[in-house]
Amino acid sequence: MMAIMIGVLVFADFQLLDAAGPISVFEIAARFAGSPASIKVLAVTPGPVRSSSGVELVARGLRPTGAISTLIVAGGEGVRTAATCEKTLAFVRAAAKRGVRVASVCSGAYILAEAGVLDGRRATTHWQRTRHFVSAYPR
């Protein structure tokens, strides 16, 4: 049985829950389905990535998305800075173009919007960021 490949994209000052929650959900779902899941933490620079709580996750670098079936983008305090990183945006665009299921948690929607993958689509983000999000990304 082939493993389902899931990537969780993080950045400096990401919200730990936004990464750990989806990781746990996919791990448990795969176990119940009897189908293995391979979950990888991804970031622009490989190595430890510090969350806003100070807890670090060890990430792989951004690699071609061919093997990934789902890409989850975390949110958090560092999201606006992360949304200006062209390597991050190019990776998200490439994943969407290849047909990878791309989703975000909370304010991770900023990265998806900046990458252009939300153009013409309805989206949501954290309620405290809604006004700014709508004005920054009206498309």
Give the residues covered by each predicted segment:
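Extended, subdomain-level signal for the structured scaffold at the beginning of enzyme domains
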Residues: 1-102, 110-115
